[in-house]
């Protein structure tokens, strides 16, 4: 599975995870 993710770095799950982390960072900054 690692090879698949490396071959297709822009997976739906990958994008979801990136967006999720991004939103969490923004939420934390806004909370502070």
From Swiss-Prot:
Entry-linked Gene3D superfamilies: Enhancer of rudimentary
Where found? Nucleus
Return one GO MF term: methyl-CpG binding
| GO CC annotation terms, alphabetical | methylosome; nucleus
Where in the chain are disulfide-linked cysteines found?
A: none
Key words, A-Z: Antibiotic, Antimicrobial, Cell cycle, Nucleus
Q: Does the keyword Transmembrane helix apply?
A: no
According to its UniProt entry, the protein's GO biological process terms are: defense response to bacterium
Family as reported in the entry's similarity comment = Belongs to the E(R) family.
- Note the subunit structure: Homodimer. Component of the methylosome, a 20S complex containing at least CLNS1A/pICln, PRMT5/SKB1, WDR77/MEP50, PRMT1 and ERH. Interacts with CHTOP.
Function of the molecule = May have a role in the cell cycle. AP 3910 has antibacterial activity against B.megaterium.
Write the protein's name. Answer: Enhancer of rudimentary homolog
Protein source organism: Sus scrofa (Pig)
Protein encoded by which gene: ERH
């Amino acid at each position: 599975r690692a090879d698949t993710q490396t071959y297709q770095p822009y997976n739906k799950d990958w994008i979801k995870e990136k967006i999720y982390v991004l939103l969490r960072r923004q939420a934390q900054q806004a909370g502070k």
